[in-house]
Amino acid sequence: MKPLRGWQLPFLQDPCFTDLLPLLQRSLLLQGPEKLLQRLAPRPSLASETFVAFRDPQAPLGLVVSQRLNRSGSCWQIQHLRSGEASLEAGEAGRMAIEAALVRAAIQGSPNAASWIATSPGTDSTRLGLLRQQGFQQLRHETLWRWEPPQQPLDLALPADLELLPLNRRTALAMWQLEQAALPAQLRQLLDRRVDDLLDQSEQPSLMLLDTNRQQAVAGVRRLRPGHREIPELELSLHPGWQHLLGQPLQLLLEQCASGLGEVLIRSDVLQHEHNQWLQSLGMAPEGEEVVMARSVWRRHAPQTSQVVSRKLEAVLGQLQPGQKPIPTPLGR
């Protein structure tokens, strides 16, 4: 179980891996600059981390690709977990053992990560079971909706107390506060997403509806940066206290954000029945379901060595030696 090296790329010709080759090549090229720039200042992730499992260097058994989800590096995501044809000889139990070892290698290979996110199709009970064995818990069950937005966005006058604003550095704090209110508490804590992370992960146009009376974002749609899906993805956030916006105001927001796109994917929680019915009324078709899994990573801090403790003790006792500046004595009142 080793990090991917450039000389291994020619051996990743298994059909299970070939679609990942452009991503792996890019990651290898950018790993050096990524580490250097991250030491200078927190920055968005440039490159993924890849671990490869192999018995024979020319026949990889599987690989795992992971990436930072925020600038601080506190949250990481497992992007891809694949087994090759060579792992089939080990049987189903052997293949699962290989994938479990890959997940552990990814987690151990990112010592600064405090939390991990992974997703799995809702119908893949094997993958879900594997993630649970590695300490992941289900935080959200989502429906993926495929939508063909209209060529002409809805022409609608918003209520007087709502203003349509683009996401930019000036308005990002309002969008971040909206997402904090809309996300489940545990997922919000594990993602550890800051304002800069929100901007890093968004493309234009990303829009929000601002309540002008409270100066508070109450609904927003972000166009996400391209990931492993070929179809662009939109993220819809609605403040829990503003569910009445389900209708034309939110439809306007979606259509404006999806302007110029042929097809898009939109996620929603399967438990939000009213929300899902409204999405379906817009002509969206369910593409499938996905489970968001997460886990925390607790690392035991190494005890201080006796040498370090001795130096600290000497520094304290040194103040009591003759010729040293006297320690002030507090005066009683």
Stretches found by the model and what they are:
Residues 50-51, 75-79, 102-107, 116-117, ...:
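Short, structured motif recognition centered on aromatic/hydrophobic residues
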Residues 62, 90, 161-168, 176, ...:
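Catalytic cores of nucleotide-enabled group-transfer and carboxylate-activating enzymes in metabolic
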Residues 88-108, 129, 133, 242-257:
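Conserved acetyl-CoA-binding loop-helix of GNAT-fold acetyltransferases
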Residues 134-155, 261-333:
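Active-site/acyl-donor-binding loops of N-acyltransferases
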Residues 213-265:
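Intrinsically disordered, low-complexity segments enriched in Gly and acidic/Ser/Thr residues
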Residues 73-94, 228-243, 247:
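Conserved acetyl-CoA binding element of GNAT-fold acetyltransferases
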